Each structure stands twice: as C-alpha cells, then as structure tokens.
Amino acid sequence: PGGCPVIPDRLLWEDADQRIQLYERYLEPVLTSTALGSIEWDSLMEIPRPLWVFEDLYCHDHPDTDPFDVYGTDWPVDEMAVQLSRYFDGVTEEQLINKYQDIYDPASGTLHYEGGRGGGPYYLRVTGWEEDGDRLTLHYEEYSAATGEPYEDSACLLTVRLLEDGSFRYLGNHKA
C-alpha cells in the first residue's frame, strides 16, 4: 500500500503481511475506480462509473498496458463485458450500453471514452477480515498519508465470493 503512515502496518499488526496480501488481491485491482470508499453497492451497475472499474481491472490484468494503448478511445463493449464478468456476476453488454447510451456507437459496438478522472492518491489499509464459507469480507479504512491516522467514518466492508478455481467475484461494498 502507498502512503507514509506514521506507524508502519508491521508495527500495528502481527499479521501485517497477510493484510497486505488481502489488500493487493482484492482492493488494489479497483483502487482508483469509484468501487471503494463511501460508495455503497451490491452489483457493478450500482457503482457510479463502471467504465473506470473496467479500466482499473484491465490495467490490473495487463500490467504493462492500458485500454487506451489497445483500443484508443473507442472501447469494444463486448470485450468490456467479458473483462468485467471475470470480477462481477451478471454483467451484460446491454447493461453497459444502457448505462453509457450517450457515448455508445452502435455501428462499431464501442464506447467512446477519452479518459480523465482527476483526483489524488487514495490510501487504504485492511483492518480485519472474516470468512464465512465462500464469502470473504474485508474491513478496510482510508487513512491520511501524512499522519497515518484513519479518516473519520471511513471504515468500509468489501465482500467477495471466493471461487474454487482461486478467482473471486466482487459482491458488494458498504460503510461499516
């Protein structure tokens, strides 16, 4: 995780290495999208910008490139649905088209997106977790990179379903 906490995670928790692994596996793939933090959701289409989630997951799965390198500014909806379906249940091309009608080109089957998110760094840490069968719930919080202190009311819960093949699906994000 990024940031410069006043007290390193390894001094806060004996199991800091496991917490860092959980962060890297489940939080980091969607860290800069709108999927984490105070936004509550139970499906991909409830996340304000699924396009950003696609971009983050694409970059996570293809570390040396991004969608702009491959597609330019016209991203194929069918390939977006396939990528997002690796991490979320029930994703369809129709959902993406309906969500982004204003930038959808039916002739090419693409969404025209020129990028641009803005914003600054986002520092999260895993503060706990619970497993219940195939469900894993991560407790996490946003913290100040300057002080290492958690921001007030930043505690959240991210739930994923663990699959037998070692992959997972995001199920929801809620305030703690």
What function would you assign to each model-found segment?
Residues 1-176:
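Mature, Sec-exported extracytoplasmic domains of Gram-positive
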